[in-house]
Regions:
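N-terminal leader/linker segments that precede catalytic domains of diphosphate-processing enzymes
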Residues: 1-83, 90-116, 120-163, 176-181, ...
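Short glycine-enriched loop/turn motifs at secondary-structure junctions
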Residues: 166-172
Length: 215
């Protein structure tokens, strides 16, 4: 029904005169609705969202070296607002080469997006792992999916942070380093400190951090 570089709309006719419209990032031969159960279980998501935690040494509140959740302010065009967001991006074809392990493309994408959106590179001291391999955003209207990947930055400074790596239509407006108490307040309030709503992936990152599931 419609096709652009990043979005397509398909008419899923599930029985005679019964139609369901699906907004997707996928080509017709890769639609999730047409996959078998086994194909569904093995598929890669469209994108990766990153839960990025800065974990300086001397980890305790009294020392002032408390771990923080690193988030950014990204303009999301359908909302018309800068939203409190996690570093995230689509899986590129080159992320899927050279390894049969389904987690490898997720890790590669997460590391690339961290560098593009924050200027930071993962080092041997840091840890990267998959939290969830595939989550659906809004399955009532789209088959778009994201993996959640944890990146723990085990370092005493975040020197070199920058948003100059933005590509395409990406627009950023700074970073937020949230303590556990600040993240908990945003969860309880349902909005950020500016009174702006946020995405379900931001909610997931806040919850994961506050619950100490990253440790």
């Amino acid at each position: 029904l419609f096709e652009s570089k990043f979005i397509k709309v398909f008419d899923l006719q599930y029985r005679e005169d019964r139609h369901y419209y699906n907004a997707t990032r996928r080509d017709e031969n890769d639609l999730v609705a047409a996959k078998s159960t086994e194909e569904f279980k093995k598929m890669l998501p469209d994108a990766v969202s990153c839960v990025v935690i800065w974990n300086p040494s001397g980890d305790d509140e009294k020392s002032g070296h408390e771990p923080c959740l690193l988030m950014n302010r990204e303009f999301r065009y359908p909302t018309g607002q800068y939203l409190l967001s996690v570093p995230a991006g689509l899986i590129d074809p080159e992320d899927c080469t050279g390894d049969n392990d389904n987690t490898a493309p997720l890790i590669k994408t997460a590391m690339r997006e961290l560098h593009e959106e924050t200027g930071l590179k993962v080092t041997e001291k840091d840890t990267v792992s998959v939290i969830n391999p595939c989550l659906f955003s809004t399955p009532g209207m789209t088959d778009e999916s994201n993996a959640l990947v944890k990146i723990v930055l085990n370092r005493d400074s975040l020197n070199g942070m920058s948003q100059e790596g933005a590509v395409g239509g990406e627009l950023f407006d700074g970073f937020d380093l949230l303590t556990k108490a600040q993240a908990k307040k945003i969860l309880e309030d349902g909005v950020d400190e500016h009174g702006i709503y946020y995405s379900v992936y931001t909610w997931a990152a806040l919850t994961y951090f506050v619950a100490d599931l990253w440790r």
